[in-house]
């Protein structure tokens, strides 16, 4: 049975976001501190981490580039890369903490 959403919600997969506001994934900008500040002013918006290079994440999976806390739910991550095997490994690294994984393939 399909879950209905109202005009003030967005549905991505099985995740319902109770806001039509989303923070864009900007490398060097949307770090944990900014996301925490945005959450105080917009408690229901979708927060997205900085864009994360799949190569960097696979090389250093414990680096703080993917740091989030429970208040960021739903948590969205954008991974960038052009090598399918690295993109898959990156998605697996983030699977436990990500509600949404956005894939950016450079052209």
Predicted feature locations:
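A structural motif
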Residues: 43-44, 98-100
